[in-house]
Amino acid sequence: MAKARPSRPRPLILRSLTAPARAQEDFSLLIYVMVAAVLVLLDFGIKTWVRIHIPLGDSQSLIPGVIDLTHIRNTGAAFSMFEGKQWFFYVTTILAFAVVAMLWRDSLHKPFYRMGLTLITAGAIGNFIDRLRFRYVTDMFHLEFLDQWRFNAIFNFADVCITLGVVFVLIYILFDRDKAAVA
């Protein structure tokens, strides 16, 4: 008599779902993974284009007085914090992935929250790829109109994804979570 093979354990969130709900959850995950992949590819493409077409340190105006593309290499984080400390970025990126994975498990039926986590993940992957390949991140977007307030930040598409993702998560925490608690 043949022994029945034990079934492969499913992630905690999927164990309590019915088969149709599990299929819907798997499809939902696929959509978010595809969105993240498109964002990572877009980030990769923009950075590659800038490295090829704009010499290091040079700028090209996109909208005069508003935004330009300035090719720089950033070995730090936002505002050049932790400059040159690559080990710090490797560790924090891996920790960020672990935290996002834990938060994802508890985010069933929270699409706004999940989109925030997806954006954060895509941005983290985009910058992580640069750090692994070059030991720096290619930044390019310079908001000229902020220079008058001595805010001379230059950032990349991955940074935009991370920032928008954090905004999505904060909006969920401040507004949507309260609605769910009342219901």
Locations of regions flagged by a protein language model:
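Alpha-helical transmembrane bundles and membrane-interface segments of multipass inner-membrane proteins
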Residues: 2-183
